[in-house]
Swiss-Prot record:
Transcription factor that acts by binding directly to the RNA polymerase (RNAP). Required for negative regulation of rRNA expression and positive regulation of several amino acid biosynthesis promoters. Also required for regulation of fis expression. Interacts directly with the RNA polymerase. A zinc finger (dksA C4-type) spans 108-132. The gene is dksA. This is RNA polymerase-binding transcription factor DksA.
């Protein structure tokens, strides 16, 4: 199985966090859990970017056939678009890591409520609770539609 197909928890080598009875939300153990996940995710993206650069350098061939050259250019273009998306994701991961340092992590940017451990394990960069995210998506559809 490639690293890209692993879940974030598998990638970080952690199990789903098990809350203990009366455990405080976003305590040091939980912060460490999410820091591991975010650092592993960041590292994976850096590795993918390095592989892309190496692949593009290895694959540069001056094809005499215009169709072959166009195919290669399209493949490179797709890879570069993917890397651009990942670059933006890396910035979001880095911003989330900073939130871990300032005790802002895990709380909704809109209403201040807890985002929840399971939601954060699925999407550690989430900055809205599920209710606020749902409302934001509804508003977005109304504006677009």
């Amino acid at each position: 199985m490639s690293r890209a197909s692993l879940s974030l928890l598998d990638l970080a080598g952690v199990k789903p966090y098990q809350m203990k009875k009366d455990e405080e939300y976003m305590n040091e153990e939980q912060i460490l859990h999410f820091r591991k996940i975010l650092n592993a995710w960041h590292e994976q993206i850096v590795e993918e970017a390095s592989r892309t650069v190496a692949h593009m350098q290895d694959e540069v061939t001056n094809f005499p056939d215009p169709a072959d050259r166009a195919t290669q250019e399209e493949e490179f273009s797709l890879e570069l678009r993917n890397r651009d998306r990942e670059r933006k994701l890396m910035k979001k991961i880095e911003a989330t890591l900073k939130k871990l340092d300032t005790d802002d992590f895990g709380y909704c940017d809109c209403c201040g409520e807890e985002i929840g451990i399971r939601r954060l394990e699925a999407r550690p960069t989430a900055d809205l609770c599920i209710d606020c995210k749902t409302l934001a998506e509804i508003r977005e559809k109304q504006v677009a539609g």
